[in-house]
Amino acid sequence: YVVTDASKKTVSYRKAANKKIKSAAIPATVKVKANGVAYSFRVTDISAKAFAGCSKLKKVTIGKNVVSIGKEAFSKAKALKKITIKTTTLKKVGKNAIKGIYKKAKISCGKKKLKAYKKLFNAKTGYKKSMKLTK
């Protein structure tokens, strides 16, 4: 994680610790200790290429505070079959963010945001018609 704004207490998920992970969960918040004091930071974005090339990754859960997904964040994660989006504030999905994931992948986002997220996940992000965006 990288602190993006100390005053607003926000961080960005930078990169998967291991390219061979099978599942990942981007939490809503993370605790950071500094000088013996624990601080809570909201995870507001997923950096570019955070999970790029994680060929064994099958499942991702995106936390409720994520506002943006960087370009090529999940590119070439060819086994990625399920993305669960818990956030209702997602505003940006970067170019080729899901390019090269499983061709019949399911992206679930909840009933309230289905229409809005259909606009975010498009051909520029790597979304294919064989994929499903569901509630």
Across the structure, where does each feature detected by a protein language model lie?
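GGW-centered surface loops in extracellular recognition modules
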Residues: Y1-A17, F121, G126
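A short acidic, amphipathic alpha-helical/loop segment
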Residues: N96-A97, L120
